[in-house]
């Protein structure tokens, strides 16, 4: 309890409230070091994720931490209250496909493609009524294009995978 009080007092004095709230949650929910890295990488600030941090997470995809990494990614991707969470998850997923455990990440993306397609219609208005979801929608479209280009999955096959019919990545003769 004293460590939580200390984090709170530091956040008030330094003005880093969001970061320190994240640290409090990390302690409260007993997140592993890898889970904390994913939370940091996909945090709700406007900065792009650190490449060094993404490299560490990519290494984690080759370990028993894989499922906890992906659990946080999918949870944050579905968050409709923070545009930065969804955007950074897409950045991280693209990075993990290139630098992480490709087969495992690919399988996760294929199984959760409907979540990524859902983000193509992401909409969030700020306090002034301005839609701040545009960048997320664009990134989702670019991610799907990247995914199709890298994995020879056509638009029809992507829809089939999203519907769960297992039609992704076939020979595609036509």
PLM segments and residue spans:
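Alpha-helical scaffold domains
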Residues: 1-174
């Amino acid at each position: 309890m004293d460590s939580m009080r200390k984090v709170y007092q530091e956040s008030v004095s330094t003005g880093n409230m969001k970061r320190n709230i994240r640290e409090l949650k990390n302690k409260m929910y007993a997140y592993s070091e890898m889970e904390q890295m994913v939370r940091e990488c996909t945090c709700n600030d406007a900065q792009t994720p650190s490449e060094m941090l993404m490299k560490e997470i990519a290494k984690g995809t080759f370990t028993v931490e894989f499922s906890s990494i992906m659990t946080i990614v999918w949870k944050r991707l579905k968050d409709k209250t923070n545009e930065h969470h969804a955007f950074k998850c897409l950045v991280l997923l693209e990075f993990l496909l290139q630098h992480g455990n490709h087969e495992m990440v690919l399988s996760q993306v294929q199984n959760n493609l409907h979540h990524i397609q859902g983000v193509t219609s992401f909409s969030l208005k700020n306090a002034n009524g301005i839609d701040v979801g545009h960048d997320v929608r664009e990134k989702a479209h670019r991610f799907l294009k990247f995914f199709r280009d890298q994995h020879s999955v056509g638009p029809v096959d992507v829809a089939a995978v999203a519907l769960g019919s297992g039609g992704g990545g076939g020979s595609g003769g036509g």
